[in-house]
Amino acid sequence: MIKDPFARLGLDREVLTVSQLNGRARVLLEDVFSNIWVEGEISNLARPASGHVYFTLKDSGAQVRCALFRQNAARVRQALKDGLAVKVRGKVSLFEGRGDYQLILDTVEPAGDGALRLAFDALKEKLSAEGLFSAERKVPLPAHPQRIGIISSPTGAVIRDIISVFRRRAPQVQLTLIPTAVQGREATAQIVRALKLADARGFDALILARGGGSLEDLWCFNEEAVARAVDACVTPIVSAVGHETDVSISDFVADVRAPTPSAAAELLAPDSSHLIRQVESLHRRLVMRMRDRLMRDRLRLEGMTRRLRHPGERLRQQAQRLDDLDMRMRRAFERQLNTRRERLIRLETRLAGQHPGRQLALLRQRLDSLAERLPRAMNEGLKRRRLQLQSQMQTLHVVSPLATLGRGYSILLDERGNAIRNAAQTHTGQRLKARLGEGELQVRVEDNHLTPVTLSLLD
């Protein structure tokens, strides 16, 4: 520690600028608080793209900014989040640009309930992955249990509340306490032994109960050994640990979770008044069913008595029924015979129509008809095609360039054979070919003005 930091920094003789003040304050802070541990709760957690981690560490009365640079952040195993209680180690420094002091951290560890909460989440995830929380493993509670084992502390309000509920709702149920510690170093082992003992006693159901407390107080119910002992129980088990807001690993593994020990007792203690009403309802239903059964038996007996008194009537009824069956059978046989006869006639008719001789005669008749129609069709087709050809030849002659030339016109062609359409395409002295309706002439351009062109014949 520095005994006289002001004398060391020369603050008694020198007037400093703000930058100098912040710089010397940073040196002083880093020298005095170079390696310290601080405990608090994370808030305002930020993770920029640089990989550094920034957050505020606070308690009920104050807060301080913290910086965890990338190389140190990579060594932190637990996931940091707002609300997590942690212990941090680092040095106090000053951000000179703003004059804010902050902690430059090299280590972050969970603290208090924060460490327990991380362990809780890790075990919960592990057991869930193994299927210990699945609905298929849950055993339904008995509707009317007679013997119930209670695993809890022999002292305190929990056992008194459970007994009070059973005395009020189901005094006939036999309760057996398997005493165990529910807090402290020995609690886990004692709870595991109590669960094994209770499961071997053949109870109808078990209650695992404890009153409220902090996460640390209830921690034995979050131990893996207790969770696996609960899962191994064949007897249906209700977990009632802590208050309604408390949740333990044993709650997830048990067959049923009750928010409080009293609620667990109510789940397993059927209301006596309800049972009485249920018995009365069953009695009324039984009486009604017995009356209905007696009535049906009486009617049946009367019917049997009537049949015994008149056997002749029964024989007459049977004879009449036999005659009716005989008539129905004869009519059915006749219908079948007529149906088969009609089908045979239809088949014979179809067979005659398919006879080869008849088919051959039909084909020969059709062939003669086609042979007679073929010459006429060919002559008519040729006549139509000849008329079409003559019409097309006349149309072609009308639009033919030769027909135009025959009327006194000519076509002028240059030496490359291109048609001359106006005087601008020619020049004086150019030799051209004039194609007439009959024959050709060689001509020479004498004048190529837009006035009519003067041509002269070549010798």
Swiss-Prot record:
Keywords: Cytoplasm, Exonuclease, Hydrolase, Nuclease
Protein location: Cytoplasm
Highest taxon of source: Bacteria
GO terms, biological process: DNA catabolic process
CDD domains: ExoVII_LU_OBF
Reaction(s) catalysed by this chain's protein: Exonucleolytic cleavage in either 5'- to 3'- or 3'- to 5'-direction to yield nucleoside 5'-phosphates
Catalytic class of the enzyme: hydrolase
GO CC, one annotated term: exodeoxyribonuclease VII complex
EC nos: 3.1.11.6
GO molecular function: exodeoxyribonuclease VII activity; nucleic acid binding
Purpose: Bidirectionally degrades single-stranded DNA into large acid-insoluble oligonucleotides, which are then degraded further into small acid-soluble oligonucleotides.
Family, as annotated: Belongs to the XseA family.
Self-association and partners: Heterooligomer composed of large and small subunits.
The name this protein goes by in its record: Exodeoxyribonuclease 7 large subunit
Species this protein is from: Pseudomonas fluorescens (strain Pf0-1)
